[in-house]
Amino acid sequence: MADRPQQLQVHPQRGHGHYEGGIKNQRGGGPSAVKVMAVLAALPVGGTLLALAGLTLAGSVIGLLVTSPLFIIFSPVLVPAAIVVGLAVASFLSSGALGLTGLSSLSWVLNYLRCASQSLPREMDQAKRRMQDMAAFVGQKTREVGQEIQSRAQEGRRT
């Protein structure tokens, strides 16, 4: 590896020397006919939309100027009415939420009881078997202890 000569190749890049601002010069030097037609078509549409936006803004300002005194005059009625409507909507929504919570709780309880009633006979049989096994175990231990007491009593008589 060390005895091989190493070569460096340089490839110059052309055409990327400076930034042109995203505009490429065309052969004709001016905008194309398609671009001119697009601008001419967009000007009336844009102007119309701008005029409609101005009319809408003017109408909104005039409407606000006309209705502001009415809002001030009727505010003793409107504010409590808005509060009542807000409370009614809030109570309706909370009633629905509590109703859904109650239904889901009831569904859970019924499902729990259904599962418990299906497993109850099996659990009762298991408990019965455990009690019988425990009674047999206690009886066996009682016999063993009784025999142990008898054997010790007989040994005590002999001595």
UniProtKB/Swiss-Prot annotation:
Disordered: annotated segments: 1-24
Localization per Swiss-Prot or TrEMBL: Lipid droplet; Membrane
Chief location of this protein within or outside the cell: other
Record carries keyword Ribonucleoprotein: no
GO cellular component: membrane; monolayer-surrounded lipid storage body
Transmembrane residue ranges: 45-65, 70-90, 92-112
Gene Ontology biological process terms from the UniProt entry: lipid storage; response to freezing; seed oilbody biogenesis
Chain intervals with Polar residues compositional bias: 1-10
Membrane topology: Multi-pass membrane protein
Tissue-wise expression: Expressed in seeds.
Record-linked Pfam families: Oleosin
Keyword presence, Glycosyltransferase: no
Job description of the protein: May have a structural role to stabilize the lipid body during desiccation of the seed by preventing coalescence of the oil. Probably interacts with both lipid and phospholipid moieties of lipid bodies. May also provide recognition signals for specific lipase anchorage in lipolysis during seedling growth.
Protein family per UniProt: Belongs to the oleosin family.
Protein name: Oleosin Cor a 12
Record organism: Corylus avellana (European hazel)
